């Protein structure tokens, strides 16, 4: 699981300028299960090449807080959302399992 401030997938005007290069690089490594980021306060989610790309909703400029806790299981990742952030279950592809 990787963490970064900027999103790279799905396509969005908040993404890193070289988002395609980074998603291509990450796809080469079967151990990568998820890429978690912020920056886009609206949040976002996509899956590409068996990797979950999760943008956590922002907690500034809103009346309601937003954050999440990720639980890691052998076959899935579970985001327990709080405030504006909704829960999400992300099944791990065979490529990311030990």
Predicted regions and their residues:
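His/acidic metal-ligating clusters that form di-metal
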Residues: 1-52
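Binuclear metal-dependent phosphoesterase catalytic core
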Residues: 43-98
């Amino acid at each position: 699981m990787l963490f970064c401030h900027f999103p790279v997938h799905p396509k969005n005007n908040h993404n890193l300028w070289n988002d395609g290069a980074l998603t291509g690089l990450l796809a080469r490594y079967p151990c990568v299960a998820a890429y978690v980021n912020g920056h886009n306060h609206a949040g976002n989610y996509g899956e590409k090449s068996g990797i979950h790309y999760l943008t956590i909703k922002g907690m500034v400029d809103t009346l309601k807080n937003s954050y999440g806790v990720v639980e890691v299981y052998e076959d899935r990742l579970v985001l327990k959302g709080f405030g504006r952030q909704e829960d999400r279950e992300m099944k791990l592809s065979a490529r990311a399992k030990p």
